[in-house]
Design a protein with these regions (language model features):
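Charged alpha-helical initiation segments
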Residues: 1-36, 138
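Long, charged low-complexity segments
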Residues: 2-8, 14, 51, 55-138
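Short, hydrophobic, well-ordered secondary-structure elements
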Residues: 36-55
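Charged, low-complexity interaction regions
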Residues: 32-39, 100-102
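Amphipathic, well-ordered alpha-helical segments in soluble domains
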Residues: 19-26, 49, 118, 122
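Generic low-complexity, intrinsically disordered sequence content enriched
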Residues: 24, 31-33, 42, 115, ...
Length: 138
């Protein structure tokens, strides 16, 4: 009987998938809103949850936050694609909730949708790559 081996524990996997589901639900709610303030708020929440899903898929989100802060202050690892993506999502979240940001509902939703889609692909691929089936010992 094959055994499943995973670099990530079930706790991290379940949180990554949960945050993806919640990001999708918040995005869906944002699409139904008429108020631009609610659209901005729900879109930002959706993007943050999508970002957290990525962080859980790659390990402890607290460590990821620390690595991001180190990369931003010291410049080390700043060219790493995952660090750059998390940094860009942070910027996008801040921009979305900024009262000076005057984009319309459609543009905000496109930004949130693209963030969710990218996060979803990354999380699912990470979970697939970090789990594999190992045969039994004879």
């Amino acid at each position: 009987m094959p055994l499943e081996f995973s670099i990530l524990d079930e706790f991290m996997k379940s949180w990554a998938l949960r945050y993806l589901r919640e990001a999708e639900a918040d995005l869906s709610l944002a699409k139904e809103c008429d108020s631009i303030e609610l659209v901005k708020e729900l879109s930002a929440i959706s993007m943050r949850k999508a970002q957290l899903a990525i962080q859980y898929a790659f390990g402890d989100p607290n460590i990821m936050e620390y690595i991001l802060e180190e990369a931003l202050t010291k410049g080390s690892l700043r060219k790493e694609p995952l660090i750059r993506l998390i940094e860009k999502i942070n910027i996008l979240i801040k921009k979305t909730v900024d009262p000076q940001f005057t984009a319309g509902k459609d543009k905000i939703l496109v930004l949130a949708e693209k963030t969710f889609e990218a996060s979803s692909i990354i999380v699912k691929e990470a979970l697939k790559r970090f789990s594999f089936v190992k045969g039994e010992k004879n």
